[in-house]
Amino acid sequence: MYDWGNSAFATTIMAAVLPVYYSSVAGSTLAPNVATARWGFTTSFSALLVAVLAPILGSVADFKGNKKKFLGFFMGIGVTATAFLYFVKTGDWLLASILYIFGNMGFSGSLVFYDALLPHVASEDEIDQVSSKGFAMGYIGGGLLLAINVVMIMFGEKIFPGIDPTLMSRLSFVSVAIWWLVFSLPLFRHIKEPTRRIEKDEEGLNPIKVSLQRLGKTFKEIRNYRDLFTFLVAFFLYANGIGTIITMSTIYGKEIGIGTTTLIGTLLMVQFVAAPFAIAFGALAKKIGTKKSIYLSLVIYTLIAIGGYFLSEAWHFWALGFAVAMVQGGSQALSRSLIGRMMPKSKSAEFYGFFSVFEKFSSIAGPFLFGLVSTLMGESRLSIVSLIIFFILGMIVLSKVNVERGIQTAKEEDERMITVS
């Protein structure tokens, strides 16, 4: 249910309501392309914070055996910052940026430790399907609350004449915080903390010292995880494009004149269409392999980025949104499960921390490039088409990954560990 709960942040805050609110209300005192650029820079900075912290905290969580506690801590930061978005009003773009930075830090940070639980609750044969079903649940849960929020925003003033025009949007931010918190509770009640496993010479040592030593050792021995590292580089490249499309599509559409109803309606459609396609990609991976399934999604994303350059009508946005829905969940779920198969289970939080570094630096580079091109050119059409370079390079590097060899390397590392209470 954590996918169901936290995905409300991804839909209402990251993708749909807040970007439009940032452009139309919080950033209404700025030029449209300036508001777009500052949203991109805000997204980049929040991702940078997580990228710096995630590997260290992941290593500490592995050593101490408390992944759930770290998950809860970051969730608390995210829920609190999201609730405080209620106080953002006209011209408050700086406050909106600060709260979004903390909200996204909490959201992304919690996912490091949530993802680290995946190899412990699913077998190697099940991990693609479990990850895909989790993403499907996320799309449905996030989409359901987004639908409720859209109804609130569209009909709130009609039902309650004379209210502040921004009130329903601000209440939607509060609803995300409540939804996220409530649907996180089953995880903390029913999922057990994984067994703590450490190296023989680490027992009784200082957690911070051990964690830094582990990180240093991992960097030194990264050649031993050649396929895992190669995949992380590939992921970094193609995730630049995917993440930027997710976070910048709505504000891009707003800039080129697509109506708010179309923007939010399309994103709502994406949530429900993406759910069955995420499950379908899990099944496809079982038939043709995880790597080939990711290839397919990246080819489609390349076509989407090209199509985005020519976007001018509302139906174009709907069509591109449907194409995104076909591949968004599958590409993310299979990437998450593939790294889970090629990492040592005893160091899952540490390696998902590294995964988060590559993911967050992709969230830095992509939106930053988008904002930079938009600033230099005065509009954002070239920004969207420039994303194809990330997909093409990602596919080239992905072709160098030997999945079976990577899985065997992870198993050999786990065999060196001892179990402690």
Language-model regions, residue ranges each:
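Helix-loop boundary and gating motifs at the non-cytosolic
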Residues: 1-47, 227-266
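A membrane-interface helix-boundary motif in multi-pass transporters
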Residues: 32-33, 153-178, 372-391
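Helix-to-loop junctions at the C-terminal end of transmembrane segments
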Residues: 52-66, 276-290, 374
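Hydrophobic core of transmembrane alpha-helices in multi-pass small-molecule transporters
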Residues: 81, 92-110, 316-330
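Multi-pass alpha-helical transporter architecture, strongest
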Residues: 87, 179-190, 385-420
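Intracellular juxtamembrane helix-capping segments at the cytosolic ends
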Residues: 109-122, 330-343
